[in-house]
Amino acid sequence: GYFGSNDPAFVPTAHEARYGVSRTGFGYRWHEADPRFDLTQNRNEPNRFGWIVEIDPWNRASVPVKRTALGRFKHESVIYVVGSDNRIAFYSGDDERNEYLYKFVPAGSYDRNDPIANRNLLDTGTLYVARLNDDGTGEWLPLVFGQNGLTPENGFADQGEVLVKTRQAADRLGATMMDRPEWIAAHPTTGELFMTLTNNSRRGNTPASSNKVDGTSAAASANPAVNAANPRPDNDFGHIIRWRENGSDVAATGFSWDIFVQCGDKATAKTLGSTYTPGEFGGQTVGYQGNIVGDDYGAPDGLWFDYFGRLWIQTDQVGNATGDWVNIGGNAMLCANPDTGETRRFMTSPRNCEVTGVTSTPDGRTFFVGIQHPGEDWVNTVLENSTWPDSGFNGPTRMSANGPVKPRSGVVVITKNDGGVIGT
């Protein structure tokens, strides 16, 4: 969406369209200011994006490294889990409607006592994509050149091309299309993994369609049917799934899964439609009211476990709290009990923003929470929606000595009045 072309004759290739590249992009118009983003001049530039980059924060002289073995897609996050045998796995979701869940298992093992020995773990290993079966089981399908149709006859010349065209490789293997997979969090003691599925307005639309096996579907263009892992059509409010690797082995190629929660609004009048029957797939399906135990929320995005095993959920819904969101209100960060599912709202956001990113000091007494793009969805001026974080200092005029106050992203620091552990 950040690339574009002023050439009216520009037509994206099937590979470019699979990654959302188009002549007009998302309207950012970067290509008009920087030729790097002009597809007419730099056709290969989009292939340099979509990779996980590793940075060593302790070494100022270090050079960031693109970890290409983890695949090329819209990595919303990456989380790792170290097994009891010191094998390690890295999990990541592709932040797009109808995309996939991935796992990378290095060939080597993690050495807890030698950080230098771990620096090259991400160079060699196996990238997998998930298939979630309706019976609650799942499979990790290897994205390996020469296997499962990833061959020159199907457009893959070598492992490098499999990685550059990760989405097409996953299409070829028949992975499960998910409702916009985003953040993943690992329980610090049980090893269970949780993933947010933010929304999917195309789920259950007619005529039904899937990502084409030959990889020629444009990004977010298919209308997948509902299934056990994505059981609601027009999944406005999203849900969170949970899975466990077989044998608690991070390198396992099988897992079991269930839905942790289906988000929603208990007071909404929105219905699933006369042609859809709640209760399919073993009773997992609920209406748009959701099955939250506690405070309502929707569009789950950020996800994080604190040191004490509490699950923190951050939302990325339409930021003006109207329409389907009028009862829920603005975006928020909530805390959930992973055992009971009980959820309580912890904080709400400024207007028209996303709450994203959270960490804490090791003692759990100070939280750092990201506030992203306040004032989004503006029509004429961003000042109509937000002047955060300066709005509290400039009064109703929203003016400073230097002119109009514009909204900015930022990080807030949160502590308890009594200095105690947050969440207690």
Predicted regions and their residues:
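Conserved small-residue
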Residues: G1-T424
